[in-house]
Curated annotation (Swiss-Prot):
Annotated EC: 1.17.1.8
UniProt keywords, alphabetically: Amino-acid biosynthesis, Cytoplasm, Diaminopimelate biosynthesis, Lysine biosynthesis, NAD, NADP, Oxidoreductase
Stated role: Catalyzes the conversion of 4-hydroxy-tetrahydrodipicolinate (HTPA) to tetrahydrodipicolinate.
PROSITE patterns: DAPB
BP GO terms, sorted: diaminopimelate biosynthetic process; lysine biosynthetic process via diaminopimelate
Gene name as annotated: dapB
Active-site residues, record numbering mapped to chain: H159, K163
Family per similarity comment: Belongs to the DapB family.
Cell compartment(s), UniProt: Cytoplasm
Residues the record lists as binding (S)-2,3,4,5-tetrahydrodipicolinate: H160, G169, T170
Keyword Cytoplasm (UniProt): yes
Annotated binding of NAD(+), by residue: G11, A12, A13, G14, R15, M16, E37, G102, T103, T104, A126, G127, N128, M129
This protein's name: 4-hydroxy-tetrahydrodipicolinate reductase
Length: 271
């Protein structure tokens, strides 16, 4: 019999952490190896089953001791903040385990540190773990390649009022897909935060607009607009469990893989 994949969850008391704990508990072939919370969290010492609303306690308490948990795990699923993710990446690299990164908001220097960690660990990193969004990215890439420069590209995203970064990681993922389709670097054509008298739209730009409010899980729309017509591609996330399920799929996929930096497109086999 194949042993269960032992998974550590970061941000165990958060919305994604609790969802992951519930799904791991329900899924055959997976076992919960522990849950991490930051120093000073009021949830430290709380049973993970209690945090996730399970009928029975798990016997595992939320802890800040990442080293102890990670060294005995098979995978780390990480929806946290960039500073914490960089620390976890170093530990995952030392332990040679699968590190699934759903954290967003990284700076360029952070991305370089993650690439360095991927020389020793299997890292699956994505701005969005859902099948639907990754299929959308493939469609956006194809559309951007097929349509000429007369078509303007704008990306609009909306999330709940508590989200702290903008544009969302998913919006950037879609922007990267559009830029790849056009054969350009996103950082060279990205247009964000338009306000006041900005002048006419620059040809070739990929624009971003971010909305925040309510409890929206995630809405993303990519608009291709030219004279007299418009193409709209989009995705609506109705339940954050889609991201958790994708992360668990990535953790399974990464078992037995060598070191490297992978995406959900790799996991899902999407070109």
């Amino acid at each position: 019999m194949t042993a269960d994949i032992k998974i550590v969850v970061t941000g165990a008391a958060g919305r994604m952490g609790r969802t992951l704990i519930r799904l791991i508990h329900e899924t055959e072939g997976l076992s919960l190896a522990g849950g991490l919370e930051g120093e000073g969290s009021p949830y430290l010492g709380t049973d993970l089953g209690t945090l996730a609303g399970l009928a029975q306690p798990t016997g595992l308490a939320a802890t800040a001791d990442a080293l102890t948990l990670i060294k005995d795990a098979d995978a780390l699923i990480d929806f946290s903040v960039p500073a914490a993710t960089l620390e976890f990446a170093a530990l995952a690299a030392q332990a040679r385990i699968v590190h699934v990164i759903g954290t967003t908001g990284f700076e360029v220097v952070d991305e370089e540190k993650i690439k360095a960690a991927a020389r020793h660990a299997t890292i699956v990193k994505a701005g969005n773990m859902s099948l639907g969004v990754n299929l959308l990215a493939a469609l956006v890439r194809q559309a951007a390649k097929a349509l000429d420069g007369q078509w303007d590209i704008e990306i609009v995203e909306m999330h709940h009022r508590h989200k702290v970064d903008a544009p969302s990681g998913t919006a950037l993922l879609l922007g990267e897909a559009a830029a790849e389709g056009r054969g350009v670097a996103l950082e060279d054509v990205s247009a964000r935060g338009r306000d006041g008298i900005t002048g006419a739209r620059k040809a070739g730009d990929i624009g971003f607009a971010s909305l925040r409010g309510g409890s929206v899980v995630g809405d993303h729309t990519v608009v291709f607009a030219t004279e007299h017509e418009r193409i709209t591609l989009g995705h609506i996330a109705e339940d954050r469990s889609i991201f958790a399920r994708g992360a668990l799929k990535a953790a399974r996929w990464g078992q037995g893989k060598g070191p490297g930096l992978f995406s959900m497109a790799d996991v899902l086999g999407i070109e």
